[in-house]
């Protein structure tokens, strides 16, 4: 009986360490000539759109499992700036807003993540995710090279980077791509220079 218990403990330890190692193994993700490549092999991104801010945190795991059950291998998420910086200079990445926890949870379920941090995301969200307080600055020109706007975008992106940089696929995480901005140029008045700067 004692030998069986020891054998089970050894087996459990091996499984625990091998699964932990598998979750933190660095990978190489790149665009090939005609397809995406993961560790040099063709990889088809089968993605589901899942907005962590629209799902109570208690249901995150269930929703990720549902996406996986549908045959998806990737979750796409928007990062709504106006949720994370409701007051200028005060950032919240905790609880319901914990994007790193959401990405790690997706990784535990064997899913990759495509992050779309905006700054503008649209997604039928108030001001496309831009915080209301940007409009307190007289004559601010959103989604342009306006100095105040670009300064605030830079600060926000750095805060997002602090949360997510360690979760990139090449660092053992599951973030395979980042899409900056959304629907840029759709209205014919957007200036391409601000997109290049971001």
Give residue spans per PLM region:
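Bacterial N-terminal signal peptides
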Residues: 7-16
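N-terminal carbohydrate-binding accessory modules
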Residues: 22-74, 104
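Conserved, mostly hydrophobic/aromatic
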Residues: 40, 75, 106, 160, ...
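Hydrophobic faces of well-ordered beta-strands that scaffold small-molecule active sites
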Residues: 46-48, 75-77, 113-115, 176, ...
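The substrate-binding groove and active-site-proximal loops of carbohydrate-active enzymes
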Residues: 46-56, 81-97, 136-154, 181-191
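Aromatic-lined substrate-binding rim segments of carbohydrate-active enzymes
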Residues: 60-126
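An active-site-proximal structural segment forming one wall of the substrate-binding cleft
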Residues: 99-115, 138-175
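Conserved small/polar residues in nucleotide/adenosyl-binding loops
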Residues: 196-198
